[in-house]
């Protein structure tokens, strides 16, 4: 594999995927239970999420990721790029004003959060451009009651 002939991280991932034993470990998460993800598992999750994203966005649309560092973060980033979106990663430690500014500035078509705690940080700053909110973990339905005073 000649890395200098590849144009993106997505190409690099799929080039490697086509050449490697898909049952080999790709990611290992030390928390909470030292989970290991094989190349097959990771690629299946990337394809599934990428297809979902493609069904919602146009090429070049922004997709915001608000998550702690975890395996799904990497899978999400690759899925967004594979779908033709632009990843907008934001830290979980920003202030409310930071979240408000970023959401207003980037106007993401999709927001992907890791869990209910992260969703609560941004729910009051959603805008009409956001068509879908995806979460790695289940979100409390009460959290979805959003006051959209635009």
Locate each region found by the language model:
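Nucleotide 5′-phosphate-binding alpha/beta core
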Residues: 41, 101-105, 110, 137-150
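N-lobe entry segment of adenylate-forming
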Residues: 1-61, 78
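Conserved ATP-dependent adenylate/AMP-binding module captured primarily in the ANL superfamily
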Residues: 92-125
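ANL superfamily adenylate-forming
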Residues: 31, 35, 120-150
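Conserved acidic residues
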Residues: 61, 109, 131
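Conserved residues at the C-terminal ends of beta-strands
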Residues: 28-30, 109, 114, 136
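Short beta-strand elements of ligand-binding domains
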Residues: 67, 90-91, 114, 131-141
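Conserved AMP-binding/adenylate-forming
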Residues: 35-36, 52-94
């Amino acid at each position: 594999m000649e890395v200098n002939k590849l144009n993106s991280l997505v190409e690099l991932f799929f080039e490697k995927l086509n050449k490697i034993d898909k049952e080999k470990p790709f990611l290992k998460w030390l928390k909470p239970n030292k989970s290991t993800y094989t190349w097959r598992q990771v690629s299946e999750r990337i394809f599934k999420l990428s297809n979902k994203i493609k069904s919602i966005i146009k090429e070049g649309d922004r997709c915001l990721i608000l998550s702690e560092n975890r395996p799904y973060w990497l899978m999400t980033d690759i899925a967004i790029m594979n779908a033709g979106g632009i990843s907008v990663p934001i830290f979980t430690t920003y202030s409310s004003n930071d979240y408000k500014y970023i959401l207003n500035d980037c106007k993401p078509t999709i927001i992907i959060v890791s869990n209910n705690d992260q969703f609560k940080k941004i729910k009051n700053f959603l805008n009409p451009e956001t068509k879908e909110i995806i979460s790695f973990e289940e979100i409390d339905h009460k959290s979805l009651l959003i006051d959209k005073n635009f």
